[in-house]
């Protein structure tokens, strides 16, 4: 009797989260190296806010927890982590100074907000100061991913230096994305100015919105965070005197050749 044909092996669909090479690289610096483990350690109200006493005075309480129980000190030096944390505190206090008065209480970072900003510090430090090593580490992570895949279509091409100047964030609804973006702007400027001079700014900082209503809303939000911001003005955008202003434009006006 003829043998029945072998059943074809069904291709296993790779989980989207497993394809986030940059995310995997960032998590490799920590212990636990997954969000679930970090959440279990940090997601407690007593760890929110700033330390006021002891060796870690001025640091976040998250920093103290990470140093004591979580951080793999062989991967990132503890003094580097301390600097990252102080930068986060500095930027967060700047954008919440006016908001604290409006709210009548001090706004503290949640653990997921802190991790997003901590990862940004690590990324920007590597990008501006250790780019060659960063590129190599990312490609090692990518090669490991490719080796684990059995289907050619799931193979990724190696990172190139020009790929590193773009980064995207994925934050849940209600996670405070607007405030995180404001801190991200300050984080980028901090590293940019450290490399190029304290009084230098990028040619333009542009915030793109989906409509005029959100442009107005973001203008107010940026003002409340202490930024110089304005709705997009083509003449201003060409003038180096306004480089410290954030230009806000809705995407419907990108093709406007007159404005």
What is each model feature region?
Residues 2-259:
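RecA-like P-loop NTPase motor core of helicase/translocase proteins
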